[in-house]
Design a protein with these regions (language model features):
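Hydrophobic transmembrane alpha-helices and their immediate junctions
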Residues: 61, 192-194, 227-232, 338-381
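Flexible juxtamembrane loops connecting transmembrane helices in multi-pass membrane enzymes
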Residues: 241, 254-291, 317-320
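A conserved mid-to-late transmembrane alpha helix and its immediate loop/hinge
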Residues: 159, 203, 312, 322-358
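Long extracytoplasmic/lumenal interhelical loops at the membrane interface
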Residues: 144-151, 278-339
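Transmembrane alpha-helices of multi-pass inner-membrane enzymes
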Residues: 11-16, 181, 372-384, 388-417
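N-terminal signal-anchor transmembrane segment
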Residues: 1-53, 75-82, 380
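Alpha-helical transmembrane segments of multi-pass inner-membrane proteins
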Residues: 120-145, 167-228
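Aromatic-anchored transmembrane helix interface
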Residues: 65-74, 86-111, 122, 127
């Protein structure tokens, strides 16, 4: 007989492995693995629905408000999606809003019978593998999966940013930021040599993406985890962490400056790190992002846009390329601009009420992963505020997976089928 634990863990691990390397599977094997991912989500939905029937529709008391808001969100999203005239935009809108919401109960069901420690260990291992490939891409100057991106000319040399199997260095950077948060949590709670090695390798992988937002989000999340686990928030602890990171940063900067004299790749990556603090006209990428934010705000204030929005999936890279949209460079602005203030507020009420319900349940039951889940949520909220990263399937799935770890029903009797 096969245990449900084995089935659920296998299906969830498949989802994680696929989403962390989807560009490899989709490029080499077509849409087969993506369709199977959709099937897994369907299996999870059926399983969750079956459990509701068995329990006669009873839900956790702490999550009742979230469930009501969830159903309301789905209804509002469907109304807006149906009203989109362009069929391609309508399909993308359904995918980004309705399907992404449908994943949540499916993830919750798959997590019910899983060993969380095993899931996290696999997640970290994936990060180590991706980091090794990322180092290869950066210093070899070639991508493992060929794409249209040719890199950046810096000091007369072509420099590339690692994306490995994620199709984008932005998505890769965000995935590596989440993996680095998990690695930091594991090292802080168990300072073994293996956990230290995993942390170092995964942070290096994050650096190879040259994505500044995920790096900043990781550092802030690490501080939150450190302070949360350490007990009461006090300035001395925060100062200690900042001081340690500053010293490490200075040592890396000195090493980088020394090595960059004859290496354009290292010089480029060092320049990217320095530009985190440069929001003047000297930094084209930062000022360009600010311009996108200001334009989004102006569009939001136009006529009735702030009430009804300009329509789901009206912004983003695919919208810009296919139906005259533009990029907001912010998931926060994206939702308010596309959905309007009312629907966007309802969505964020659902999101934060779900996180709050998860934290309450986790504290009550002594869930050991509260700090980790909180760190991941903060990491993605920061990144999604400065980049519309949650329109990526992999990022949204992983974010909700960590939130659902707080909400999941603890394993009792292991059913067999």
């Amino acid at each position: 007989m096969i245990k449900k634990t084995q089935i659920n863990e296998s299906l969830l691990l498949y989802c994680i492995i696929y989403l962390c390397s989807f560009n490899f599977w989709d490029t080499k094997f077509g849409m087969v693995f993506k369709y199977f991912f959709f099937c897994v989500i369907l299996i999870g939905l059926i399983g969750y629905g079956k459990r509701l029937l068995v329990n006669k529709g009873k839900i956790q008391t702490t999550a009742k408000g979230s469930v009501i808001l969830y159903m309301f969100c789905i209804e509002l999203f469907l109304i807006q999606v149906i009203n989109v005239e362009n069929s391609s935009q309508r399909n993308l809108a359904f995918y980004q809003y309705v399907f992404f919401m449908m994943m949540i109960p499916s993830i919750l069901y798959l997590l019910e019978y899983c060993e969380i420690r095993k899931i996290l260990n696999v997640f970290k291992t994936i990060g180590v593998v991706l980091s090794i490939f990322a180092i290869y891409e950066v210093f070899s100057g070639s991508y493992i999966i060929q794409n249209e991106y040719l890199g950046i000319m810096y000091n007369g040399s072509r420099v590339i940013r690692a994306m490995v199997f994620s199709g984008s260095f932005l998505t890769f950077g965000t995935i590596m930021a989440m993996i680095s948060v998990v690695s930091f949590y594991d090292f802080y709670t168990n300072t073994s040599k293996l956990n230290l090695i995993c942390l170092i390798i995964n942070v290096v992988g994050l650096l190879m993406s040259s994505s500044r937002g995920p790096l900043v989000a990781f550092v802030i999340s690490a501080i939150v985890i450190y302070v949360y686990i350490g007990g009461r928030v006090n300035l001395l602890k925060v100062f200690k962490v900042i001081l340690i990171m500053f010293i490490i940063g200075m040592l890396l900067a000195i090493l980088g400056i020394t090595l960059s004299r004859n290496n354009s790749t290292i010089a480029f990556y060092l320049n990217r790190l320095q530009s985190i603090f440069d929001w003047s006209e000297n930094s084209a990428s930062n000022t360009g992002r600010i311009d996108c934010w200001l334009y989004s705000i102006e569009k939001f204030k136009d006529k009735t846009n702030w009430i009804f929005g300009i329509g789901p999936a009206a912004t983003g890279a695919r919208a810009k390329a296919n139906w005259g949209g533009f990029v907001t460079e912010s998931g926060l602005f994206k939702r308010f601009l596309e959905l309007g203030a009312v629907v966007a507020v309802v969505y964020y009420m659902f999101f934060f009420s779900t996180v709050h319900a998860g934290l309450r349940k986790a504290r009550k039951e002594g869930n050991q992963y509260i700090a980790l889940a909180l760190g991941i949520v903060i990491c993605i909220l920061i990144e999604d505020t400065i980049l519309q990263i949650t329109e990526e399937l992999s990022v949204t799935f992983l974010l909700w997976m960590f939130i659902c770890i707080l909400l999941r029903k603890e394993k009792q009797n292991d059913e067999r089928i």
